[in-house]
């Protein structure tokens, strides 16, 4: 397929590169290392793609698939708070409280193909085919629609793998695992493109995110964790992975009809980081979070637990000695819930990445009266914005948002009261911060090294539009991840639900190449009584292990 041969798009393909960032891509493009991506940039439009706040895959991919902000789709993290409780449970695709844009494509008679999109497990009966992505527990559950597709993939690949095993962060094992999974994702995409009809197709490659978290420092001499010997061994690993993706994209292009519009995107960007801020420890220092006295003491058991965790033995012992029901997110929620003295705690940082006021009539042990809420929240905001890292003398946060500043819709009340935005984009990784809500660091400073993380998510991902109907070589600014859903619907002449928050990116198209966007009065999302995500205990353990390995449940 060559660019701009056909003015009107007849089909759309989205290629997702989870975590891709122009900081990495631009130098490699200029050096000629990624010829396929360079071809797309030269022949299409490109620019940054603004993610959600927070720029976490759970929020971002849910906003991609629905075209709405988290206040409407209801996903605020990889976990969701159980109503009337301090506990959290894992979320999944069933937690999304509104319809995905491909549902509207299917209702319009267009066949869709969906491969490896995060937050699509459990699978749904789409008009076409689906293979679920991140958060799929494993190959022993239902992960595809129609069911015979699952059998086809298992026959073709044997064990079908959805994500890397993060029980180890050893570089060679991680690189090998990501390569094998990427090759499987590529081969699956090519198989489906060849054998099944589609008018809309998406494939998401998760390898960039998985590698960049742990290998970024080897590629960046400015990074405090950079080591010459390690860089000699692993400094080329990120480029080599992107070259594998570049070749995969070239193969995919070879299977696309001339009337295809291609959108290449990432759900967020990436940048180096070196520091960690234990926000619940800071709240404890301020007297806003209080632990029971037995939890506050750094006992022999606490020391031993931390040591076993650091050397990788804690999880093995837990699995060997404890019942399965204790080895899940429920266990971590229980530890947190029982460690905190809620009768004296006024605020806490939850697993969903935000701060919550311990409010009367909302939290089960709430002590903050409704008339105190606004003043306490503003006080907390001002004090946290003033916190500086003692090593860098730089603020920890760039902003601290009220819930209502970011989210609107029927589910907005379920969001945390305050959403912190840490330093992410400083060119010096030593200044960039990972927020951590765990209680493991109970007597230490709120500040520590970010190891094993050497990089974390940023707000701006990548966006390229190429192929049928695209305006030509230029940069486009202002695109947001919620804009992709209405843009895809408009390109295929399907009415856009009026409740969608995104806009049609009309500036990427040649004049007159797509019909005037039409809008429908589809019903706005509602709010169920409680969390909708549901895993069995065994499934929860499998998914939680991966998420903790990535640092997403700290």
What are these regions (language model features)?
Residues 6-7, 175-197, 201, 211, ...:
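A long, amphipathic alpha-helix that forms part
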């Amino acid at each position: 397929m060559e660019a701009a041969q056909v003015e009107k798009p007849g089909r759309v393909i989205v290629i997702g590169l989870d975590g891709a960032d122009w900081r990495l891509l631009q130098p490699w493009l200029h050096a000629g290392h990624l010829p396929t991506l360079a071809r797309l940039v030269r022949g299409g439009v490109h620019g940054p793609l603004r993610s959600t706040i927070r720029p976490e895959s759970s929020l971002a991919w849910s906003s991609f698939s629905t075209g709405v902000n988290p206040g409407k789709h209801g996903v605020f993290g990889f976990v969701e708070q159980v109503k009337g409780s301090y506990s959290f449970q894992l979320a999944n695709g069933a937690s999304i409280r509104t319809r995905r844009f491909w549902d509207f494509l299917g209702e319009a008679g267009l066949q869709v193909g969906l491969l490896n999109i995060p937050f699509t497990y459990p699978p749904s009966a789409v008009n076409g085919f689906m293979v679920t992505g991140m958060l799929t527990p494993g190959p022993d559950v239902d992960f595809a629609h129609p069911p015979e597709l699952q059998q086809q993939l298992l026959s073709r690949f044997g064990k079908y793998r959805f994500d890397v095993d993060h029980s180890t962060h050893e570089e060679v094992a991680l690189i090998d695992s990501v390569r094998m999974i990427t090759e499987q994702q590529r081969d699956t995409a090519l198989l489906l493109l060849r054998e099944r009809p589609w008018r809309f197709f998406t494939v998401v490659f998760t390898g960039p995110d998985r590698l960049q978290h742990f290998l970024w420092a080897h590629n960046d001499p400015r990074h405090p964790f950079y080591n010459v010997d390690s860089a000699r061994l692993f400094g080329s690993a990120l480029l080599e992975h992107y070259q594998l993706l570049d070749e995969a994209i070239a193969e995919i292009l070879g299977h696309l009809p001339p009337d295809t519009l291609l959108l290449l995107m990432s759900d967020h960007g990436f940048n180096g980081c070196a520091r960690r801020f234990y926000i619940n420890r800071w709240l404890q220092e301020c007297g806003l979070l209080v632990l029971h006295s037995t939890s506050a003491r750094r006992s022999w058991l606490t020391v031993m637990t931390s040591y076993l965790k650091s050397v990788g033995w804690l999880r093995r012992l837990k699995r060997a000695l404890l019942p399965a029901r204790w080895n899940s997110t429920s266990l971590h929620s229980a530890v947190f819930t029982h460690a905190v003295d809620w009768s004296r705690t006024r605020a806490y940082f939850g697993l969903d990445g935000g701060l919550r006021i311990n409010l009367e009539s909302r939290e089960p042990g709430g002590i903050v009266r409704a008339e105190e809420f606004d003043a306490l929240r503003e006080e907390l905001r001002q004090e946290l914005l003033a916190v500086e890292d003692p090593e860098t003398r730089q603020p920890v946060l760039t902003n601290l948002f009220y819930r209502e500043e970011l989210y609107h819709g029927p589910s907005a009340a379920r969001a945390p009261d305050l959403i912190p935005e840490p330093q992410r984009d400083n060119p010096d990784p030593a200044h960039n911060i990972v927020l951590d809500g765990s209680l493991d660091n109970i007597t230490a400073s709120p500040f520590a090294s970010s190891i094993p993380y050497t990089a974390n998510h940023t707000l701006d991902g990548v966006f390229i539009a190429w192929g049928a109907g695209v305006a030509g070589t230029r940069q486009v600014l202002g695109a947001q991840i919620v804009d992709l859903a209405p843009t895809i619907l408009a390109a295929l002449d399907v009415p856009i639900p009026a409740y969608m928050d995104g806009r049609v990116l009309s500036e990427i198209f040649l004049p007159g190449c797509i019909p005037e966007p039409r809008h429908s009065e589809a019903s706005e999302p509602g709010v169920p009584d409680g969390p909708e995500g549901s895993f069995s205990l065994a499934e929860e353990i499998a998914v939680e292990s991966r998420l903790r390995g990535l640092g997403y449940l700290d």
